């Protein structure tokens, strides 16, 4: 029986206006594009790296 994949919920708390293009692209990669949006993502090293890159724009709500 396979283990369930761990997930992480991330909410965008600040705007992407006047941010570097790479930070905007990272938000799109995290499935976030508006303040208040919440995305449930798989908890992988790649996702953690993307969150770290835009940590000033998002917050982690829940880690399951």
Swiss-Prot record:
Region (Disordered): 1-22
Taxonomic superkingdom: Bacteria
CDD domains, per the entry: Ribosomal_L30
GO molecular function term, any single one: structural constituent of ribosome
Cellular component terms per the entry's GO annotation: cytosolic large ribosomal subunit
Keywords: Ribonucleoprotein, Ribosomal protein
Keyword Ribosomal protein: yes
Keyword Ribosomal protein: yes
Self-association state and partner proteins as the record states: Part of the 50S ribosomal subunit.
Family per similarity comment: Belongs to the universal ribosomal protein uL30 family.
Name of protein: Large ribosomal subunit protein uL30
Organism expressing this protein natively: Nitrobacter hamburgensis (strain DSM 10229 / NCIMB 13809 / X14)
Gene designation per UniProt: rpmD
């Amino acid at each position: 029986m396979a283990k369930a994949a761990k997930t992480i919920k991330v909410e965008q708390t600040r705007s992407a206006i006047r941010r570097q293009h790479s930070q905007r692209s990272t938000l799109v990669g995290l499935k976030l594009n508006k303040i208040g949006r919440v995305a449930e993502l798989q908890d992988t090293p790649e996702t953690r790296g993307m969150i770290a890159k835009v940590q000033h724009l998002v917050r982690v709500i829940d880690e399951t």
